[in-house]
């Protein structure tokens, strides 16, 4: 599924929350076990992809009523300076045996010359299900590819799909929670890259927000 998708996003932050550029459910980023997919890229910059991921139950296999299956597809278009993509997924047993359909739009723009102007990536996803509140998530990221010897990026977005509904009487507590992050990636040598990141993640009312630092080290041979 998502490994063959070409989501229109040029933001390269290393966190596992905002790295999906706002389309984590529609792009099947989480996976469910077994996966399959196919994609085809046209010379015009258009790419078409389909994907499947699923997990059987203890008594039944894939693509059965007892299992969990996700079917989806993506249409994307990319050029050197801009791109857009539409992603769709039908998720069975998304929450408490309720299925949900997700749609996402993503886009990016990159300046003709690197410098003071960053590249911009955005994403917005909605989830629908009969008799349930719609969910949504969003993402905005900016990245400077030539910031001194490395790449600098900042982003903000929801921490996942949310209904933004809080109803104490019904026992619903699903507010919009945001995450903010900034990273700087630079090469130590030809085979090693260091990427420190600082982030703040909002939590539900009554809990302190989470702030942390992580460092990603990448090697190439």
Where are these regions (language model features)?
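Surface-exposed coil loops of outer-membrane beta-barrel proteins
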Residues: 1-71, 164-166, 172
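Transmembrane beta-strands of outer-membrane beta-barrel proteins
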Residues: 1-2, 49-53, 85-89, 108, ...
């Amino acid at each position: 599924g998502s490994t063959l998708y070409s989501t229109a996003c040029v933001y390269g932050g290393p966190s596992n929350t905002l790295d999906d550029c706002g389309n984590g459910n529609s792009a099947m980023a989480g996976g469910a076990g077994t996966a399959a997919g196919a994609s085809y890229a046209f010379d015009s910059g258009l790419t078409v992809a389909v994907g499947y991921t699923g997990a059987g139950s203890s008594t039944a296999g894939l693509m059965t009523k007892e299992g969990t299956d996700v079917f989806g597809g993506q249409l994307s278009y990319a050029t050197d300076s801009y791109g857009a993509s539409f992603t769709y997924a039908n998720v069975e047993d998304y929450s408490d045996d309720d299925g949900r359909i997700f749609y996402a739009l993503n886009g990016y723009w990159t300046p003709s010359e690197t410098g003071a102007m960053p590249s911009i990536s955005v994403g917005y996803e909605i989830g629908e299900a009969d008799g349930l509140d719609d969910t949504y998530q969003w993402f905005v990221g900016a990245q400077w590819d030539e910031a001194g010897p490395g790449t600098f990026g900042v982003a903000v977005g929801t921490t996942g799909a949310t209904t933004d509904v809080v109803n104490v009487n019904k026992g619903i507590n699903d507010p919009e929670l945001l995450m903010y992050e900034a990273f700087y990636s630079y090469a130590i040598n030809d085979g090693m890259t260091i990427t420190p990141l600082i982030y703040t993640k909002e939590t539900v009312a009554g809990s302190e927000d989470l702030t942390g630092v992580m460092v990603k080290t990448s090697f190439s041979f």
